[in-house]
Regions:
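Noncatalytic, beta-rich nucleic-acid-contacting surfaces in large DNA/RNA-processing enzymes
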Residues: 1-285
Length: 285
């Protein structure tokens, strides 16, 4: 896999092969992932390398891995530490969207915290005009507790204290994570394959649509008309990919698009060895 960094098709093929042989592919995660893919024999798992992520490079990947033993009490603490590395805003946002920092919270929570970190000039702001935050009573109150106040602005900001309180407040909001479809789209955009796999038995029948193709009849009175839909799927629970066929009339009752998720209720294998979907429903998670 390391030899194919940057080749999305080859990497996707290798990942599919590994999954079919029951070798788990673990997504990039802070404290665990190195720049390159590596195989953990004890866990029988391959950890994705962070340098395989678009716009990431080996230098930044190694800097992140070097931080694996850092004692960090919050995401804000991490953001301050990251200022000493070469990571840029685009790279950081991509990692957040991919769940790389999930130990600190879900992607939507962390993006909100990061946006405010950026608003306060990467935690270094000395002043802020009241007019910029007067429409946010919570933020206005937090800043007022950690700064001096004049008629038009707050100055002598204790940014770290402000951002710590902001993070604590955001965690009370119970902000929902990205939808599964958004996570899948992010996986595809930034890594070229889907690493969103839960490992849960109950999620095995939940199938991500990777590809679909209309099957057209070429004989008889129905020539030129579609009779079925050939689909390639990936199990959300196991990561295993499969090829199946859906009857066109059934498809018309509940259509789906690429990266949608369907719940497979019933299927069979016909006498030609093809898997036929008998019943399914499109789900939103």
């Amino acid at each position: 896999m390391n030899a194919w960094n940057g080749d999305d098709d080859k990497t996707a093929e290798a990942i599919t092969y590994a999954q079919r042989n029951k070798i788990r592919i673990k997504p990039p995660r802070f404290r665990h992932s190195k720049a390159e893919y590596y195989f953990d024999a004890e866990e029988r798992a391959i950890y994705r390398g962070t340098s395989s992520i678009k716009f990431l490079n080996e230098g930044v990947s190694n800097e992140l891995y070097d931080m694996r033993d850092e004692e960090l009490n919050s995401f804000v603490d991490l953001l301050y530490k990251l200022k000493d590395t070469g990571i840029n805003a685009r790279q950081l946002e991509i990692l957040i969207k991919l769940g790389y920092f999930e130990e600190f919270g879900n992607a939507c929570e962390l993006l909100k915290i990061y946006n405010l970190f950026d608003f306060f000039k990467n935690g270094e702001a000395k002043t802020v005009a009241k007019s910029k935050i007067e429409n946010d009573n919570i933020l206005f109150g937090i800043v007022s507790r950690h700064a001096n106040e004049t008629t038009k602005q707050f100055n002598k900001l204790d940014c770290h204290a402000i951002l710590d309180e902001i993070e604590s407040y955001i965690r009370t909001l119970q902000i929902k994570d990205l939808s599964m479809k958004d996570k899948i789209a992010n996986d595809m955009e930034y890594t070229g394959s889907i690493s969103t796999i839960t490992g849960k038995e109950e999620d095995r029948p939940k199938l991500i649509i990777l590809d679909k193709r209309m099957l057209i009849s070429n004989r008889g009175k129905d020539a030129g008309k579609p009779w079925g839909v050939a689909i390639t799927t990936q199990s959300l629970g196991s990561g295993i990919q499969s090829s199946m066929t859906v009857d066109y009339k059934q498809y018309c009752k509940e259509k789906f698009d690429i990266h949608d998720i369907i719940y497979l209720k019933k299927f069979h294998k016909n006498n030609r060895g093809y898997f036929i979907v008998d019943n399914y429903e499109r789900i939103f998670i």
